[in-house]
Amino acid sequence: MLKPLGNRVIIEKKEQEQTTKSGIVLTDSAKEKSNEGVIIAVGQGRLLDNGTQVAPQVSEGDTIVFQQYAGTEVKRGDKTYLILNEEDILAIIE
């Protein structure tokens, strides 16, 4: 399993819908890149210049919205994960 360092989080992206509401099947090139995912692992938080550790605002299992082109994709086995900085997370979906 991947363990994020610092203020990074690892997410599993939500799959984009294969069809539109009207039933049209989308090709891979027509689909928009998903910017939602579920947090799989969270780093220990950000370290300030004075040495203070700031705890992350998100936790494992949170469903989030993140910036469209943020992060680095990493493949482990048959799954693809995205490693993001916590600052790239825009919102938690409740």
Curated annotation (Swiss-Prot):
GO function term, MF aspect, one: ATP binding
Q: Does the keyword NAD apply?
A: no
Which PROSITE patterns does this one have? CHAPERONINS_CPN10
Q: Which InterPro entries match?
A: Chaperonin_GroES, Chaperonin_GroES_sf, Chaprnonin_Cpn10_CS, GroES-like_sf
Family annotation (CDD domains): cpn10
- Key words of the record: Chaperone, Cytoplasm, Stress response
Matching Pfam families = Cpn10
Subcellular locations according to the entry:
Cytoplasm
> GO cellular-component terms in the record?
cytoplasm
SMART domains to which the protein is assigned, alphabetical? Cpn10
- A Gene Ontology biological process annotation? chaperone cofactor-dependent protein refolding
Q: Which family does it belong to?
A: Belongs to the GroES chaperonin family.
The subunit field of the Swiss-Prot or TrEMBL record says: Heptamer of 7 subunits arranged in a ring. Interacts with the chaperonin GroEL.
Q: What does this protein do?
A: Together with the chaperonin GroEL, plays an essential role in assisting protein folding. The GroEL-GroES system forms a nano-cage that allows encapsulation of the non-native substrate proteins and provides a physical environment optimized to promote and accelerate protein folding. GroES binds to the apical surface of the GroEL ring, thereby capping the opening of the GroEL channel.
Question: What is the protein name stated in its UniProt record?
Answer: Co-chaperonin GroES
Species of provenance: Staphylococcus epidermidis (strain ATCC 12228 / FDA PCI 1200)
Q: Which gene encodes it?
A: groES
